[in-house]
């Protein structure tokens, strides 16, 4: 099978999102051919270069999302009219709100209008050579303004001023850049058997257009739902970009785009049930949804997982990226309660800060730990020691990630916000008992192999930790069960095998019949066998339970 792998800001670049799982997927499926179509996220990412590519990668085509030169295309009167109609329909659909903001009938009509406008713009870009100049023009801003002022538009859209309109128009121009690419010809995405978008949003746009122009089926994988990410980041920009009108219109655009992607995809995979619920909320058909857990390398934790008795029985370990969402403050307060019941308990916090905010938060946590737990000494002549330590991977105390997990009897996760808890899976690979807060996909990942408590509840967190510290046999049982669960569900091998099966299923259900031409350009006879169009059920079917088999003689008499 020839796969067109679509990425945004990741593979095959050295830096970026989702690069590791894409690389493992491509390397693990050596029986397939891969064409990589990558949208880069920054100039620095392009300068960093690519990872080494395996031989099954046939070609790589890239395009920058962070910059686009003016294509120099000047539209004639007819092309301008087509652009005004399509862009006007797109803007009108956005001004009516997102996919979940209206009634079912009107929402379906607006979804059709959005999809038709999107494909109309793509066809215009294909015919005229690009959309960049038109999307950056003053005419595009005026079209957007008319849509915002039209009767029936969102109230927040009516309030959009010139700076807000310019911000929305600029965002739409960047988001629609894939429409102007030359990837959709017969020697590009039109030649693949299946498009696999490694995320939603811009990465899935080329897959939508390949389906529109060439009938190529689309598979979409989301380990983090792009629409949710947009919602979380919508307040982080400058004032004119976080105004209510801008947020409403851009949320409508991303919501409509997500609904169109989910509607046209042959299959949509989520990394966990949390992401799957978001996909259903955004319009994905439940029949198309599959859960494929992220695949992680278990080999580096094998030695620790097979030697569960190496841990200090009094040590709690937290491992992760230091930032406010990890709620280390609650963990420190909980550890104060733990020390009341288990005076020998120690807490190791292993991780580096995430940016300036993380560094400030780490400083705050260190000050709080010094205040809550003054240095203690065993005797009058001994040196005082703090029961809480802050370390980083690579330091003498924690040379490797596996050794950090190995040092603890109980691994603690105290987050208030979490997507897929990678650190929790790593602890499970190590065969360690865990105490986690009920956020994100924690319950789905841990199952019944660890203790789960409400977030922002230091007392509940402390009680769970004390219960495990006092019961070594229970820790051993939970650790063994957690390791078995992780090896069954979260390895690279199961992830690769799941996608291999999905590829074959999609291609078998939606085969592409292309017109085969000979050297002279004439149709090649017998290129497609007649049985390719023969209707029938090719899968073996079993009679329903309790049914009576009919003999051939009786069937002939009928």
Q: Model-predicted segments: where are they?
A:
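Nucleotide-activated donor-binding/catalytic signature segment of Leloir-type glycosyltransferases, i.e.
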Residues: 242-244, 362-399
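Conserved donor-binding/catalytic core segment of Leloir-type glycosyltransferases
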Residues: 300-337, 346-353
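Short alpha-helical donor nucleotide-sugar binding micro-motif in glycosyltransferases
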Residues: 402-408
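Aromatic "clamp/platform" in nucleotide-sugar-dependent glycosyltransferases that forms part
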Residues: 416
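Short hydrophobic beta-strand element within catalytic cores of glycosyltransferases
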Residues: 433-436
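Short acidic/histidine- and often glycine-rich active-site loop of Leloir-type glycosyltransferases
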Residues: 439-452
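Conserved acidic donor-binding segment of nucleotide-sugar-dependent glycosyltransferases
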Residues: 451-458, 467-473
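A short, well-ordered alpha-helix in the C-terminal region of glycosyltransferases
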Residues: 460, 474-489, 495-505, 515-519
């Amino acid at each position: 099978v020839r796969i067109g792998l679509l990425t945004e800001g990741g593979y095959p670049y050295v830096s970026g999102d989702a690069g590791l799982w894409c690389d493992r997927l491509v390397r693990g499926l050596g029986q397939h051919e891969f064409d990589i179509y990558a949208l880069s996220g920054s100039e620095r990412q392009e300068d960093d270069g690519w990872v080494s590519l395996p031989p099954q990668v046939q070609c790589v085509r890239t395009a920058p999302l962070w910059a686009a030169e003016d294509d120099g295309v000047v539209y004639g009167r007819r092309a301008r009219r087509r652009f005004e109609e399509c862009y006007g329909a797109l803007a009108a659909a956005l001004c009516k709100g997102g996919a979940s903001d209206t009634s079912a009938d009107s929402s379906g009509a607006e979804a059709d209008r959005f999809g038709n406008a999107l494909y109309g713009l793509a066809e215009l870009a294909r015919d005229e050579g690009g959309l960049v100049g038109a999307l950056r023009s003053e005419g595009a801003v005026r079209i957007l303004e008319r849509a915002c002022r039209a009767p029936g538009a969102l109230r927040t859209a009516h309030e959009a001023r010139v700076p807000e309109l310019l911000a929305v128009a600029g965002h739409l121009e960047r988001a629609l850049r894939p429409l102007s690419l030359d990837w959709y010809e017969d020697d590009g995405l039109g030649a693949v058997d299946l498009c696999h978008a490694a995320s939603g949003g811009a990465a899935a746009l080329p897959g939508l257009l390949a389906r529109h122009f060439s009938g190529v089926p689309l598979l979409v994988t989301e380990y983090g739902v792009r629409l949710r990410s947009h919602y979380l980041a919508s307040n982080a920009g400058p004032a004119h970009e976080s105004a209510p009108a801008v947020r409403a219109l851009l949320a409508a655009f991303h919501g409509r785009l997500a609904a169109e992607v989910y509607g046209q995809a042959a299959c949509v995979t989520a990394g966990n049930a949390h992401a799957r619920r978001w996909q259903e909320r955004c319009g994905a058909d439940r029949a198309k949804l599959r859960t494929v857990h992220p695949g992680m390398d278990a080999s580096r934790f094998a030695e620790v997982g097979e030697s569960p008795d190496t841990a200090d029985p009094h040590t709690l370990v937290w491992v992760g990226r230091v930032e406010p969402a990890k709620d280390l403050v609650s963990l420190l307060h909980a550890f104060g309660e733990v020390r009341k019941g288990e005076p020998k308990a120690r807490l190791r916090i292993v991780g580096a800060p995430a940016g300036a905010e993380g560094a400030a938060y780490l400083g705050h946590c260190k000050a709080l730990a010094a205040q809550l737990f003054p240095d203690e000494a065993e005797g009058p002549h001994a040196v005082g020691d703090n029961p809480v330590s802050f370390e980083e991977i690579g330091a003498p105390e924690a040379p490797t990630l596996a050794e950090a997990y190995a040092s603890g009897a109980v691994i603690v996760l105290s987050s208030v916000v979490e997507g897929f808890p990678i650190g929790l899976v790593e602890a499970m690979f190590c065969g360690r008992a865990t105490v986690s807060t009920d956020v994100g996909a924690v319950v789905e990942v841990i199952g019944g192999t660890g203790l789960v408590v409400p977030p922002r509840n230091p007392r509940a967190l402390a009680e769970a930790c004390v219960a495990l510290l006092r019961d070594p046999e229970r820790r051993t049982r939970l650790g063994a069960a957690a390791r078995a669960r992780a090896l069954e569900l979260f390895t690279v091998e199961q992830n690769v095998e799941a996608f291999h099966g999905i590829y074959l299923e999609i291609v078998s259900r939606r085969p592409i019949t292309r017109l085969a031409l000979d050297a002279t350009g004439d149709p090649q006879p017998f290129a497609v066998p007649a049985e390719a169009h023969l209707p029938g059920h090719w899968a073996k079917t079993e009679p329903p339970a309790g049914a009576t088999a009919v003999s051939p003689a009786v069937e002939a008499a009928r």
